[in-house]
Swiss-Prot record:
This is ATP-dependent Clp protease adapter protein ClpS. One of its GO terms (biological process) is proteolysis. Involved in the modulation of the specificity of the ClpAP-mediated ATP-dependent protein degradation. Gene3D superfamilies: 3.30.1390.10. SUPFAM superfamilies: ClpS-like. The gene is clpS. Disulfide bonds: none annotated. Belongs to the ClpS family.
Amino acid sequence: MSSTLDTQHDVVVEKQPARTAPPPMYQVVLLNDDYTPMEFVVKVLQKFFGKNSEDATRIMLQVHHEGRAVCGVYPRDLAATRIAQVSQYARARQHPLQCIMEPT
């Protein structure tokens, strides 16, 4: 913390360090469809969400059985980027895989 002296009015002003709140977080949710192969979903989870084979398989099975699963939790911009990357990657390979983001 630093102090400055205003010599004209003899006032000491103490500067407080700025406190910023953490950004709101969003979960990226992978949605089930009837066409995207399970192996492709596992690959997407590994490539874009950094999941190991075991975690990627577990999440893929949750998507398959429950219709959806959380892939990760990120600040809004990063969540939106992950969704765009997955969508572009899936479309380029002719798969209808979809992700959405939801506030935590």
